[in-house]
């Protein structure tokens, strides 16, 4: 009976870990696809980075751009465009989330192009 209980506990807890990656939430597949697309291109200068943030109670992903005059774009977990908090000619992004700098909390660096 004890081994059955232990087996059941192991089974149930292993299912809870499938959404985690090294103790962190798994990268959504659409975000991974965006990263994979960048990997197919020549290395950017500066190198591409993807950061995970918590913004307005949502999990979002900040993609750096490959040039100073392009927007640094933020996408939600479903790859819906949220805003561009920085970049562009003005450096202030698209002005759709002017509070990003103050309200967004960085969770982690998800990926950096180390090629």
Where in this protein do the model-derived segments appear?
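Sec-dependent N-terminal signal peptides
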Residues: 4-12
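N- and C-terminal low-complexity/disordered segments
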Residues: 2-4, 17-59, 64-115
């Amino acid at each position: 009976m004890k081994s059955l209980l232990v087996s059941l506990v192991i089974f149930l807890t292993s299912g809870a870990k499938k959404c985690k990656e090294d103790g962190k939430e798994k990268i959504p597949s659409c975000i991974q696809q965006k990263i994979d697309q960048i990997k197919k291109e020549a290395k950017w200068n500066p190198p591409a980075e993807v950061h995970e943030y918590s913004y307005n109670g949502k999990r979002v992903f900040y993609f750096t751009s490959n040039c100073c005059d392009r927007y640094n774009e933020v996408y939600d977990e479903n790859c819906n465009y949220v805003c561009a908090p920085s970049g562009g000619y003005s450096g202030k992004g698209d002005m759709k989330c002017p509070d990003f700098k103050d309200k967004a909390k960085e969770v982690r660096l998800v990926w950096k192009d180390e090629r």
